[in-house]
Amino acid sequence: VAAGDPLLKEREPFGIFGAAHSLDRNPMDLPATTPTSVCGGADLTEQWDSGWDASSYLAAMDAQDITAAVLYPSVGLFVPFQADITHRAQADACAGYADWVAEYCATDPTRLAAVGIAPLGDAVLAADEARRAAALGLVGMLARPNLLHGRNLGDRFYDPLYDALEETGLVLAVHEGMGVRGGPTMGS
């Protein structure tokens, strides 16, 4: 958490486990219509009870015959789109995630890779974070396709980020979270 940024402190993540946040012991973001086969029929009780630490995640991959995975953030992907958090605090939160996920992947880097989060409020900070993520061994940077401060990802504002991605060889992974709201859509 960035010193002096109470708005970020208020949004500090914390774990909540319980029936209200699970569906038959699957993460809550799986819709009720998700078939059991999505997990290959694997019993993921151990992973749930372990809080999905890296070792239990690898065991779940083994149970489902998954060789390797690229990890994306969940709730963290929304950080760069909080308009009331300073750009520095957004970058600090993205850096914290990158540090954590790099350590998580270090459990078995032959099987686990990850993308960092681009703090898109400030393209220079995003470029700095891309270089840092590359140094940590991450394979890309995530950006949501939503408009931010009236800009889409094709805006020249983001050139410093794109230059850093080209320099480091990282990919830009564009991934929406819960659906684009309030922005332009195809055909509009």
List where the protein language model places each region.
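Helix-coil boundary/capping segments in enzymes
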Residues: V1-S188
